């Protein structure tokens, strides 16, 4: 009987396959997304130097103040996207390469991307 690969292993394979093809630079960094069951994280990475330029997540106190008590997971993800776009703008970054890290472009990942685009980040 064949062993069935888990969804996490499949996502990890997709992530590695995509990371071979896309890289971020100082002018056009990689917008990386990580999604857990409870939180969502986004960071801008310059792969040439191996440096994280800025990051945003649901753990930040500024985001908790902005949202108050509600919003749901998708609303919170959109707010994280808006926050990462604002931080990128303050660094003078207009364009990014979107790295969804093997996740489907749906739900929270899509909401984060739309939030970043709404604040003027291009990808």
Curated annotation (Swiss-Prot):
Protein name as annotated: Large ribosomal subunit protein uL18
Any GO MF annotation of the entry: structural constituent of ribosome
Keyword Transferase: no
Quaternary structure note: Part of the 50S ribosomal subunit; part of the 5S rRNA/L5/L18/L25 subcomplex. Contacts the 5S and 23S rRNAs.
HAMAP family: Ribosomal_uL18_B
Xref: NCBIfam families: L18_bact (TIGR00060)
Keyword Transferase carried by entry: no
GO biological process, one term: translation
GO CC entries: cytosolic large ribosomal subunit
Task of the protein: This is one of the proteins that bind and probably mediate the attachment of the 5S RNA into the large ribosomal subunit, where it forms part of the central protuberance.
Alphabetically ordered keywords of this record: Ribonucleoprotein, Ribosomal protein, RNA-binding, rRNA-binding
Name of a matching Pfam family: Ribosomal_L18p
Record-linked Gene3D superfamilies: 3.30.420.100
Family to which the UniProt record says this protein belongs: Belongs to the universal ribosomal protein uL18 family.
Gene name in the database record: rplR
Matching PANTHER family: 39S RIBOSOMAL PROTEIN L18, MITOCHONDRIAL, LARGE RIBOSOMAL SUBUNIT PROTEIN UL18M
SUPFAM superfamilies recorded: Translational machinery components (SSF53137)
Organism: Desulforudis audaxviator (strain MP104C)
């Amino acid at each position: 009987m064949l062993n069935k690969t888990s969804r996490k292993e499949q996502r990890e394979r997709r992530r590695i396959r995509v990371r071979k093809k896309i890289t971020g630079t100082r002018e056009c960094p990689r917008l990386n997304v990580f999604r857990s069951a409870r939180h969502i994280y986004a960071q801008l990475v310059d792969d040439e130097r191996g440096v994280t330029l800025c990051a945003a997540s649901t753990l930040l106190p500024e985001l908790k103040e902005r949202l108050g008590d509600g919003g749901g997971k998708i609303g919170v993800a959109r707010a994280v996207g808006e926050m990462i776009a604002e931080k990128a703008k303050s660094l003078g970054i207009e364009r990014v390469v979107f790295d969804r890290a093997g996740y489907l472009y749906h739900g929270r990942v899509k909401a984060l991307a739309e939030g970043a685009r709404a604040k003027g980040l291009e990808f």
